[in-house]
Amino acid sequence: MTGATILVADDDAAIRTVLNQALSRAGYDVRITSNAATLWRWIAAGDGDLVVTDVVMPDENAFDLLPRIKKARPDLPVLVMSAQNTFMTAIKASEKGAYDYLPKPFDLTELIGIIGRALAEPKRRPSKLEDDSQDGMPLVGRSAAMQEIYRVLARLMQTDLTLMITGESGTGKELVARALHDYGKRRNGPFVAINMAAIPRDLIESELFGHEKGAFTGAQTRSTGRFEQAEGGTLFLDEIGDMPMDAQTRLLRVLQQGEYTTVGGRTPIRSDVRIVAATNKDLKQSINQGLFREDLYYRLNVVPLRLPPLRDRAEDIPDLVRHFVQQAEKEGLDVKRFDQEALELMKAHPWPGNVRELENLVRRLTALYPQDVITREIIENELRSEIPDSPIEKAAARSGSLSISQAVEENMRQYFASFGDALPPSGLYDRVLAEMEYPLILAALTATRGNQIKAADLLGLNRNTLRKKIRELGVSVYRSSRSA
């Protein structure tokens, strides 16, 4: 829609000049101002086909002006620019009815493209205005990578689209899921999280979908599942790559038909739940290995969102440190200041545990060190002390990997820790043996390209015994091509 009039408001003269020149070259009529009062006068008079405005101006904040604009001219697209590149800025822009949000500095080509799309669209449905009552900062970071995540989340807030979050362990996948829920249309419903890796495989279906009385040994009463608990809200499926095949089939039915049955039940139950899934695995590789359903993958991967590792957004570390120090202060710990050399050293660290590792370090420093200022020397000592010192970790460091018994011991330690002061459900011995059998049989079948005779010989099992275990454990049998 060349020839359209663009109203530009920014108190920075250089930005006004750049936008005036770029938009004029693109064929638009441009009117520029440095204040909100003039912008509002133009809009109230019916001038302009689109607005490009900064958030902070000398006389009024654009977020205060936006509701008046949307009330007076609900079809007028408003693009918001801001140097305050935070998650809440993106959310406020969306909630107040902005067409889009651009963090400064931005790409002019991208801006012109957004303007073209906005002007080409039919009249837009007015956005629901929300009370700006939450000033918390659920996500922290001003890097380019985080800006893109903020923009995607802002666009998803008022939808029920299924989201697949990928990223390394500790990157904040559950935080993103919670932010999407807390600031989205389902905020008044429950947020329910379940970690597939922390639940025994034979209990996952019951945990997800619930079970009826007498559905299996030990089911003495009816139990609600996570889907029922999350009704009207959001269900976060963490470590989705660890979900067994039977549970995957049930989940696919929910996504396809919007209903499920409890374990042992016959009556379908309608489901009104937004699903957000997360994994640190390569699910496409799992599909090729026969461990994950391809049709389920595409049902879950409607909107993919990859969270970057902390080493790829090291510029966010000072903001994250300040955030964690503030959290520690709220918990009654002393306020600490990190000197610049300490921060630079932290920015250079690879952080294999990502944001979770950084948070643990900051909490440890605020709790254990009497110094008001955290120096480079303190950080060096702490990072050096992270060299493994337990017998298991020392063995792993020497060999480069954990032995099977060490891996089991470490896994069981984490498993018991996940229950806090409580104990896991009874029957742990049989569950652990089953957990060991599954990967062992799968590895043997993979090594023998699905040949059960060779796999049985490799395992030292009778062929019929192997077949029985394959059925009981739900091991996926597949054959790989011999040719490269």
Curated annotation (Swiss-Prot):
InterPro entries: AAA+_ATPase (IPR003593), CheY-like_superfamily (IPR011006), Homeodomain-like_sf (IPR009057), HTH_Fis (IPR002197), P-loop_NTPase (IPR027417), Sig_transdc_resp-reg_receiver (IPR001789), Sigma_54_int (IPR002078), Sigma_54_int_dom_ATP-bd_1 (IPR025662)
Listed Pfam families: HTH_8 (PF02954), Response_reg (PF00072), Sigma54_activat (PF00158)
A molecular function GO annotation: ATP binding
Residues recorded as bearing 4-aspartylphosphate in the entry: D54
Entry annotated with the keyword Nucleotide-binding: yes
Outcome after substituting N464Y: In ntrC283; appears to be constitutively active
Predominant subcellular localization, coarse grouping: cytoplasm
PROSITE patterns on file: RESPONSE_REGULATORY, SIGMA54_INTERACT_1, SIGMA54_INTERACT_2, SIGMA54_INTERACT_3, SIGMA54_INTERACT_4
Keyword Phosphoprotein: yes
Chain residues that bind ATP: 167-174, 230-239
Keyword annotations of the record: Activator, ATP-binding, Cytoplasm, DNA-binding, Nitrogen fixation, Nucleotide-binding, Phosphoprotein, Repressor, Transcription, Transcription regulation, Two-component regulatory system
Disulfide bonds: none
DNA-binding region: 452-471
Post-translational modification: Phosphorylated and dephosphorylated by NtrB.
Protein name, UniProt field: DNA-binding transcriptional regulator NtrC
Organism, scientific name: Rhizobium meliloti (strain 1021)
